[in-house]
C-alpha cells in the first residue's frame, strides 16, 4: 500500500497532466469544450479515473468521450513518463455530472423557498382556533352580579 499523501499527490498530477495534454496536444475535432475536474488513482497506482465535464449537449458529450477514448494511449504514455512510475496507470474517463446535480439542487432549493413563502402567507392570515380565552374561569361567589347579598331588612 502507498502513502495516502503520495496517492493524492499523484492523482493531482494526473489531473494536471491530462488537462494540459488535452488542451495543447490533442487536435481531435470531436473534442468539445472540456474541463478536467478531478482524478483519482488507486492505492497501488495502477488505475486512474479522470473526471471531466463538457459544455454542450449530449452530442458534444459523446463526441468528447470518443475523442478521449481514441487519445487514451497517448495520454497514458505521457502520464506514465511524467510520473516516473514503474507501471503507467490505466486511464478511465468518466463524465462528471456535477452540472446536473447543481441544477437539481437549485430546483429543490427553489421549491423549498416557494413552500416557505406559501407557509408565511398562510401564517399571516391565520387566526386562533377557538375563543380568545380557551380556558374555563371559575367564578367566585361574590363576583356574580345576579346574586345580591341578603340585606339586613330581609332577615327579620
Curated annotation (Swiss-Prot):
Spell out the PANTHER family in the cross-references.
RIBOSOME-BINDING FACTOR A, CHLOROPLASTIC-RELATED (PTHR33515:SF1)
Record's subcellular location: Cytoplasm
Q: Which GO terms describe its biological process?
A: maturation of SSU-rRNA
Q: Which family does it belong to?
A: Belongs to the RbfA family.
Q: Which Gene3D superfamilies match?
A: 3.30.300.20
Say which species the protein is native to.
Salinispora arenicola (strain CNS-205)
Which residues are the signal sequence here? Answer: none
Q: Which residues does the annotated region (Disordered) include?
A: 129-156
Q: Which UniProt keywords apply?
A: Cytoplasm, Ribosome biogenesis
Key word Cytoplasm present in the record? Answer: yes
SUPFAM superfamilies in alphabetical order? Ribosome-binding factor A, RbfA
- What Pfam families does the annotation carry? RBFA
Q: Which residues cross the membrane?
A: none
- Keyword rRNA processing (UniProt): no
Domain of life, source organism: Bacteria
Supply one GO molecular-function term. Answer: ribosomal small subunit binding
State whether it acts alone or in a complex, and with which partners, per the record. Monomer. Binds 30S ribosomal subunits, but not 50S ribosomal subunits or 70S ribosomes.
Under which name does UniProt file this protein?
Ribosome-binding factor A
Q: Might you report a single GO cellular component term?
A: cytosol
Amino acid at each position: 500500500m502507498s502513502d495516502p499523501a503520495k496517492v493524492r499527490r499523484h492523482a493531482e498530477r494526473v489531473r494536471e497532466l491530462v488537462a494540459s495534454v488535452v488542451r495543447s496536444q490533442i487536435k481531435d475535432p470531436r473534442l468539445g469544450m472540456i474541463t478536467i475536474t478531478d482524478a483519482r488513482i488507486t492505492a497501488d497506482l495502477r488505475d486512474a479515473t479522470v473526471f471531466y465535464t463538457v459544455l454542450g449537449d449530449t452530442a458534444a458529450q459523446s463526441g468528447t468521450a470518443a475523442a478521449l477514448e481514441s487519445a487514451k494511449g497517448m495520454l497514458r504514455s505521457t502520464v506514465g513518463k511524467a510520473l516516473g512510475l514503474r507501471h503507467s496507470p490505466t486511464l478511465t474517463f468518466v463524465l462528471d455530472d456535477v452540472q446536473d446535480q447543481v441544477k437539481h439542487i437549485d430546483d429543490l432549493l427553489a421549491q423549498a423557498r416557494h413552500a416557505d413563502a406559501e407557509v408565511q402567507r398562510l401564517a399571516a392570515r391565520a387566526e386562533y382556533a377557538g375563543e380568545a380565552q380557551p380556558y374555563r374561569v371559575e367564578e367566585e361567589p361574590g363576583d356574580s352580579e345576579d346574586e345580591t347579598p341578603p340585606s339586613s331588612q330581609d332577615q327579620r
